[in-house]
Design a protein with these regions (language model features):
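N-terminal leader/targeting and accessory segments in enzymes
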Residues: 1-88, 223, 227, 257, ...
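Short internal beta-strands
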Residues: 62-68, 228-232, 369-370, 393-401
Length: 482
């Protein structure tokens, strides 16, 4: 591809390269740069890509895309933001694949993963569509599963994934769009037919300076979509949409809106309600428990409506939808009279939601096993401790993903918020042992909620990912004790 074709979507500040030059690929990691490639010097959190220009040149880079003139004697192009430029040249390199598919973006603190899976199911059931999914647990091309390491991949990998989806026959793509991705321009150049917002609660304050900054980052989605579907019951919504340029639709479980849930019934095995939208009404039954499921369902229904699907067909498809791995997932406990749930509740709001849901159907004690991640927002630790103290009968504080922090210091910060607990918290830093302790002390009718890991099958300790699948911990305990 000619350099000028890659530069076409950019606002170029300085051009010191032959626009007719052939480019053989794009690289933003000097360690993997190949001869003839365009090297994009991206400024990262830990390192500035401009420092690695000499290495990229040494490896044969044909030209450099940068924010300031390099010292090396090499053809270069200066732009205002290489992060944004990486997204745009990557889209051009792969032939703008997102332009050929219907793109749906989901943002919010909690509920994104469940919402994407539900919407994927609806589109497959009602349209027979082949749907791509970009998410926390995994990426999917139709039924093919691809493992993933972050909610939204770096822009080059994202465009490559879109190209693979389009080549495989996908007509729709549903993405979890994180605040990081919006802030760091990973989705620059992608236009969404529909964007929808689940909720906003405290999280990622290690990255965003405050909740207002976090909200504003999420709100960027509604400047790059045609229709936005937003939660009218969330107090952050007015700020979120203040700069929206798209058509806005609102959904609510409390008051009249473009889509409203009426006659809500919460059950131990799911929820049901009447969805009302203009002159349409349909009964919705979804086999995922919790009041938060009503909101996830409303957002998904409204997004599907925005794509032109009738309410009755959407409701029928939802009735056959299954739960998502690591989201209120019931773990088999044969021979035991108690229940074990695994849930990805790693924020104050999600922890409160799952514990309230469990308390609504639990016949015995609610036992919460939880911790907080290291190298992440420390302010939520005592808050989550207070939530567990208030809503759990027994709280077992343990290690989550401590990363480079001292796990015992994280636990100390959690316990600092647990004054007034029904019983003093039990502290067991070793997570498998904490799970076993909970199972040792569970009585008939109790529900043990393993919070924070969800779909993850590893624990991050230091810079290492160590295998830890809570399902295996439960199964191993049962094998030894039955």
């Amino acid at each position: 591809m000619k350099l000028k074709e890659l530069l076409a979507p950019l606002d170029v500040c300085e051009l010191h390269a032959d626009p007719e030059r052939d480019i053989t690929g794009i690289s933003y990691d000097s360690r993997t740069t190949q001869p003839g490639e365009l090297f994009v010097a991206v400024t990262g959190f830990a390192a500035d890509g401009h420092k690695f220009i000499p290495k990229a040149v040494e490896r044969g880079a044909a030209a450099i895309l940068c924010e300031r003139a390099p010292e090396a004697d090499v053809p270069y192009v200066v732009v205002g933001s290489t992060r944004r430029a990486l997204a745009l040249v990557s889209a051009a390199w792969f032939g703008h694949p997102a332009d050929h598919m219907t793109m749906i973006g989901v943002t919010g603190t909690n509920g994104k993963t469940t919402s994407t899976y539900l919407l994927k199911h609806i589109l497959e059931q009602t349209l027979g569509a082949k749907v791509g999914l970009v998410g926390t647990i995994q990426n999917m091309i139709g039924d093919e599963v691809l493992e993933t390491e972050r909610t939204t991949p770096e822009s080059y990998e994202l465009q490559k994934l879109f190209a693979e989806m389009y080549a495989a026959g996908c007509t729709h793509v549903i993405m979890e769009v994180s605040s990081h991705a919006l802030t760091l321009d990973r989705v620059a150049g992608v236009h969404f037919a529909v964007g929808f917002f689940t909720n906003l609660t405290e999280d990622h304050l290690d990255f965003h300076k405050d909740m207002e900054d976090y909200c504003d980052a999420k709100g960027k989605l509604f400047g790059i979509c045609d229709t936005g579907c937003v939660n009218a019951d969330d107090p952050w919504t007015p700020r979120l949409v203040k700069d929206a340029t798209c058509r806005l639709l609102r959904y609510s479980a409390k008051a009249a809106a473009d889509l409203t849930a009426e006659h809500i019934a919460l059950h131990s095995d799911g929820v049901e309600f009447d969805a009302v939208s203009g002159g349409e009404r349909a009964h919705v039954r979804l086999g995922i428990p919790g009041a938060f499921t009503v909101y996830n369902a409303l957002g998904v229904i409204q997004a599907a409506q925005a794509l032109g699907l009738p309410l009755e067909k959407i409701a029928a498809a939802l009735s056959t939808a299954k739960g998502v791995k690591g989201r209120a997932e019931v773990v088999p406990t044969p021979g035991k009279d108690y229940t074990v749930l695994i849930d990805y509740s790693h924020t104050p709001d999600s922890l409160e939601n799952i514990l309230k849901t469990v308390r609504g159907f639990c016949r015995g004690h609610v036992i919460a096993v939880f911790g907080c991640g290291g190298d992440r927002d420390p302010f939520k630790r005592p808050i989550m401790g207070g939530i567990a103290a208030r809503l759990a009968d027994v709280a077992v504080v343990t290690s989550d993903n401590p990363r480079t922090e001292d796990p015992n210091e994280i636990i100390r910060q959690i316990v600092a918020g647990m004054d007034g607990a029904k019983t003093p918290p039990t502290v067991i830093e070793n997570r498998p042992k904490a799970i076993e302790w909970a199972m040792d002390h569970a009585e008939p009718g109790d529900v043990i909620v393993l919070c924070g890991k969800g779909h993850e099958t590893y624990q991050e300790i230091g810079h290492e990912k160590r295998h830890l699948d809570e399902r295996e911990v439960v199964a191993s305990y049962l094998e030894r004790t039955l």
